[in-house]
Swiss-Prot record:
Signal peptide: none annotated. GO terms for biological process: heterochromatin boundary formation. The heterotrimeric Elba complex consists of Elba1, Elba2 and Elba3. The heterotrimeric Elba complex is required for chromatin domain boundary function during early embryogenesis. It binds to a 8-bp sequence 5'-CCAATAAG-3' in the Fab-7 insulator or boundary element in the bithorax complex and contributes to its insulator or boundary activity. Elba3 lacks DNA-binding activity and plays the role of an adapter protein, bringing Elba1 and 2 together, thereby establishing a complex that recognizes the asymmetric sequence motif through the BEN domains of Elba1 and 2. One of its GO terms (cellular component) is chromatin silencing complex. Its main location: nucleus. This is Early boundary activity protein 3.
Length: 379
């Protein structure tokens, strides 16, 4: 495993659990993203090794229901692989892309083969839960080049593992640039399939609803899958059912947070979107490095980044007012926490001023004593 969290900044899945209690996950505590630091050994097997690992967390993953401690102590707890871990907050933002940018920047120096060639590949695999479309970055040293298929416009084939054949979508001699290309493809794909439906009365979700979701089970990988709502977990506790879904892959105890791109009662509609995404990656023109430098918006998604956040969209679709009340409550908690923090800062300033005044007074008294003593000696 790398020293970067499974949620590498290239996804919106927030790998590992959401806010959890003895009775299951709780509601979101705050609509914010955090860049945090944890011990790599603790994340792997519960034994600290002193190596730093960076991870992206959402408030919904944190165990504390009171957000005020986050502003004061900078330490939070979250659950992963059945363990409760403590993380040190590095920064927080209401926009995920800001945390992603910080993660990419801080992790650049820690990666190996930063200048080596990277391949962006695409393949499908069949799981018990259904077919998955996977796009990921791989090193050419870890694959075997096979052939080229003319009907796929010359996209070469590579073997990633026995029985796993992938198409090369793009290749370049810069890992940093290729990470941005994966983000670009992800954003464009999201825009293509996203249902931007803000109707007053959206279609209700039930166990028979089919969803096209996007998630990342590991760094530098994006997965698309059509799943039925009944296949997700933590359904009762999920306040944002039409925005996010909690998924547990077969044979794994890890819960992934997936983004719901579109949903409906007709599976064929979602399958058609899935197949469109599968074809779309072969037709897209990827921007060159200099184009990304001149036009950073190439990396962003109109649907995912430029519009209001997905969680705000959930609030807009909130017909009962539940989300709005939650957000109002959280904003009040945030204001209270910030007010308490300012009170503590003011208190420290007051104590500091008192200490300075005392020191100044003591210094003046000492000078007076010295002057009196010196005068007595002269007489």
């Amino acid at each position: 495993m790398s020293n970067i969290s499974n949620d590498s900044g290239l996804d919106d899945s927030a790998n590992s659990g959401a806010v959890v209690s003895a009775n299951g996950p709780l509601a979101a505590t705050r609509l914010s993203w955090f860049l945090a630091e944890v011990d790599d050994g603790l994340m792997k097997d519960g034994k600290p090794n002193g190596r730093r690992r960076l991870c992206v967390l959402h408030s919904m993953e944190l165990l504390e229901s009171d957000v005020s401690d986050k502003y004061m102590t900078r330490f939070v707890e979250f659950r992963v692989n059945g363990m409760v871990l403590e993380a040190k907050l590095i920064l927080a933002a209401d926009e995920r892309r800001l945390v992603d940018a910080a993660l990419l920047s801080m992790s650049k120096e820690e990666r190996e083969d930063a200048g080596g060639q990277q391949l962006l590949v695409q393949y499908t695999e069949n799981e018990k839960a259904g077919e998955r479309l996977i796009q990921k970055l791989v090193s050419p040293n870890n694959v075997m080049l096979l052939s080229t298929k003319p009907e796929l416009k010359g996209n070469p084939l590579v073997r990633l593992a026995p029985g796993c054949i992938a198409h090369i979508l793009y290749a370049y001699e810069s890992r940093d640039y290729m990470e941005k290309i994966l983000l670009h493809l992800k954003a464009r794909s999201f825009d293509l399939a996203f249902d931007d439906n803000l109707e007053a009365e959206p279609e209700a979700m039930n166990d028979d609803t089919w969803m096209l979701v996007q998630y990342s089970p590991e760094p530098e990988m994006v997965v698309y899958q059509v799943v039925q709502y009944r296949q997700t977990v933590w359904r009762k506790e999920n306040l944002f059912k039409d925005v996010i879904a909690y998924m547990q892959l077969p044979g794994s105890d890890i819960v992934l947070q997936a983004v719901v791109i579109s949903y409906g009662q007709d599976k064929e509609v979602q399958d058609a979107k899935y197949e469109e995404l599968q074809r779309f990656s072969f037709d897209i023109d990827f921007p060159l490095p200099e184009e990304l430098e001149k036009h950073p918006d190439h990396m962003t998604s109109t649907a995912l980044f430029s519009r209001t956040s997905l969680y705000q969209k959930a609030e807009q679709r909130d017909t009962t007012g539940e989300h709005r009340e939650l957000r109002k409550s959280l904003e009040q908690m945030s204001e209270k926490a910030q007010g308490e923090a300012q009170m503590i800062i003011d208190a420290f300033d007051m104590v500091d001023n008192i200490n300075k005044n005392l020191q100044s007074r003591l210094s003046g008294e000492v000078r007076s004593v010295v002057e009196v003593t010196s005068g007595d000696e002269l007489h």
